[in-house]
Curated annotation (Swiss-Prot):
Pfam families associated with the record: BRCT (PF00533), DNA_ligase_aden (PF01653), DNA_ligase_OB (PF03120), DNA_ligase_ZBD (PF03119), HHH_2 (PF12826), HHH_5 (PF14520), Nlig-Ia (PF22745)
Cross-referenced PANTHER family: CHROMOSOME TRANSMISSION FIDELITY FACTOR 18, DNA LIGASE
Name of the gene: ligA
Chain ranges of the BRCT domain: 596-681
Record carries keyword Repeat: no
Protein species of origin: Pectobacterium atrosepticum (strain SCRI 1043 / ATCC BAA-672)
Protein name from the UniProt record: DNA ligase
A biological process from GO: DNA repair
Length: 681
């Protein structure tokens, strides 16, 4: 066997291994970009040496075999994948090939869509009813996931409208948005459950649950992008019009779709999406470009594993391989000690990455990470870079275990890890310089006291020069002291003093949030303020009283009581609010007495879920609260009502499971109109 044949055999072996890891085990070992490079190399070798092409080559089929745990489903129309291009030159070559075949390349209309990073599925509707859902599998045979798909709120169980075919197979992508993914992992860390590396793995793992009740709790959503089988009916003759028809039937379709004439407009769309992808709220890895005319698609036909009339125009890689050179430990405002990996610098999604958070000891154990490992680093949009896997096959003999410190790396205080929690914390409190800095940065942040111009570097200097130890010290600073800071002139110093004075006028909710009570975010702070109305009432509240507040459970109640009972914190709060001293103040909070309100929401714990189209989420919360409702962020047995907007997901499913009444936005608006001031509606 010659050198080329040996390389072809090796590439096939490696690609098959990674196909199995990716498609079957949902545990990819290498980034997509590395897999794509290997596939491109094999394609090139087979193109140069066609005598080496075999029917079982990875270039001749779509993916790997499905798991046997689910019933297998044979696709009546194969689910093919797309060929990829990775730069503008390659895309233009694709466009030219099509233009040459059709003799009208510059005038050709393309339908451009987002390339979603989730799990491809097919949905079979008969007489408008969802009867079967399946994964792609190997393109010919997939897995029957109907029971799980039925739990995804974005997917209609019945199509609505006219001209619905007798049988139609809709194809699309199930994925998870960033917000839902982060909440899922937060809950997993809190309970010691499995933490997912990225939203794609979370979506795939959620659909492969044998128990649909687990899938129902996962924040999955769906966009459709094509059709497979079609019997007993007709669809429009353009891809764009088909998507619009799907939308009319109640199927979710992305609003980031554009018809482009010629390659120049396609490139403009690609660049625009690449620049704005971080604001989408979910992962994409490129743009899919399809010839819009179905007649022209038919003329162009297919190659072995992909259509000639479409291509995936991929973005620069968001995952890359690099080495862990060291691990250091940082201390946050609540004392949480976070391990940070120092990496061999590598370009990921156009940014040089040299650090990645490791979260906690459990995450290090889950990854099996050691210093010196070869790792996969991911950076998506503005998300902090993270290590999502290691390449065990490249682990050197010189690796060293990562050992958590027994004492705080900043102040030397003892560290502790409370049973049932994933986080290790410094016990030094505000004697720890790191905690002091982070607590002060939080106090002046935009969503807290909002001290304009008081940036992180200024706080660092104030603490290091020992000008400031508590939040109260900030308001004692003079312009003269400020001018002693780096890059701080008299005018800037005076502006900061004025900003601190302005920040004294705030709200009780902002003040409570600014204090940095553990696990008390903006929403919980607002609920505490609305429920108790004053600091005095909050200080007097026992655990039972705190548990009456929406979103406050036993753990949060304990954190609030512990913070308010701590003598140092009481001193700081007195200093900050003393009318004869610093005098931070806020308007009186009117506490709503549900018993005095004639409203269907009075005294009810209400949860909002999904997207609202008439009111904003904040407007809805304000209106509901004004009518006596307690607006909570999570569904539990204490929930009295769920208001479900569009694309409601796991909260709606949980409400249905618990038998909690559910109304839609229109019904909420009707009730608000009947029982409140309609001028704001």
């Amino acid at each position: 066997m010659n050198a080329v044949a040996l390389r072809v055999a090796e590439l096939r072996r490696v690609l098959r291994h990674h196909e199995y890891k990716y498609h079957v085990e949902d545990a990819p070992e290498i980034p997509d970009i590395e897999y794509d490079k290997l596939m491109q190399e094999l394609k090139a070798l087979e193109a140069d040496h066609p005598e080496l092409v075999t029917s079982d080559s990875p270039t001749q089929r779509v993916g790997a075999a499905p798991l046997a745990a689910f019933e297998q489903v044979r696709h009546e129309v194969p689910m093919l994948s797309l060929d990829n291009v990775f730069d503008e030159e390659s895309y233009l070559a694709f466009s030219k090939r099509i233009g040459d075949r059709l003799k009208n390349g510059d005038d050709l209309t393309f339908c451009c869509e987002l390339k979603l990073d989730g799990l491809a599925v097919s949905l079979l509707y008969e007489e408008g009813i969802l009867v079967q859902a399946a994964t792609r599998g190997d393109g010919t045979t997939g897995e029957n996931i109907t029971s799980n798909i039925r739990t995804v709120g974005a997917i209609p169980l019945r199509l609505e409208g006219e001209n619905i075919p007798r049988r139609v197979e809709v194809r699309g992508e199930v994925f998870m948005k960033h917000g839902g993914f982060e909440k899922l992992n937060e809950e997993a860390r809190r309970t010691g459950s499995k933490v997912f590396a990225n939203p794609r793995n979370a979506a795939a793992g959620s659909l492969r649950q044998l128990d649909p009740r687990i899938t129902a709790k996962r924040p999955l959503t769906f966009f459709c992008y094509g059709v497979g089988l079609l019997e007993g009916g007709e669809l429009p003759a353009s891809h764009w019009e088909r998507l619009m028809q799907f939308k009319a039937w109640g199927l979710p379709v992305s609003d980031r779709i554009k018809l482009c004439t010629g390659p120049a407009e396609v490139l403009d769309f690609y660049r625009q999406v690449e620049q704005t992808r971080s604001s989408l709220g979910f992962d994409i890895d490129g743009v899919v470009v399809k010839v819009d005319s179905l007649a022209l698609q038919e003329r162009l036909g297919f190659v072995a594993r992909a259509p000639r009339w479409a291509v995936a125009f991929k973005f620069p890689a968001q995952e890359q391989l690099t080495w862990v050179r060291d691990v250091e430990f940082q201390v946050g405002r609540t004392g949480a000690i976070t391990p940070v990996a120092r990496l061999e610098p590598v370009a990921v999604a156009g940014v040089i990455v040299s650090n990645a958070t490791l979260h906690n000891a459990d995450e290090i154990e889950r990854l099996g990470l050691q210093i010196g490992d070869r790792v996969i680093v991911r950076r998506a949009g503005d998300v902090i870079p993270q290590i999502v896997g290691i390449v065990e096959s490249e682990r050197p003999e010189t690796v060293q275990p990562i050992v958590f410190p027994a004492a705080c790396p900043v102040c030397g205080s003892d560290v502790e890890r409370v049973e049932g929690e994933a986080v290790t914390r410094c016990t030094g409190g505000l004697i720890c310089g790191a905690q002091r800095k982070e607590a002060l940065k939080h106090f002046v942040s935009r969503r807290a006291l909002d001290v304009e111009g008081m940036g992180d570097k200024i706080i660092d200097q104030l603490v290091e020069k020992e000008y400031v130890k508590t939040p109260a010290d900030l308001f004692r600073l003079s312009a003269g002291i400020m001018t002693g800071l780096d890059r701080m002139g008299p005018k800037s110093a005076m502006n900061l003093v004025n900003a601190l004075e302005k920040a004294k006028s705030t709200t009780l909710a902002r003040f409570l949030y600014a204090l940095g009570i553990r696990d008390v975010g903006e929403s919980t702070a607002a609920n505490l303020a609305a429920h108790f109305g004053s600091l005095e009432t909050l200080f007097a509240a026992d655990e039972d009283a705190l548990l009456e507040v929406p979103d406050v459970g036993k753990i949060v109640a304990a954190h609030v009581r512990h913070f308010l009972e701590e003598e140092h914190n009481q001193t700081v709060i007195r200093e900050l609010t003393d009318p004869a001293g610093i005098n931070i103040y806020w308007p009186e909070v009117k506490v709503v007495n549900a018993e005095e309100i004639d409203s269907p929401f009075a005294g009810k714990t209400v949860v909002l879920t999904g997207s609202l189209s008439i009111l904003s989420r904040d407007e809805a919360k304000d209106r509901l609260t004004a009518l006596g409702a307690k607006v909570s962020g999570s569904v539990s047995k204490k929930t009295d009502m769920v208001i479900a907007g569009e694309a409601a997901g796991s909260k709606l499913a949980k409400a249905q499971e618990l038998g909690i009444p559910v109304i839609d936005e229109a019904e909420m608006i009707r009730l608000l109109n009947n029982h409140g001031d309609v001028s704001t509606l």
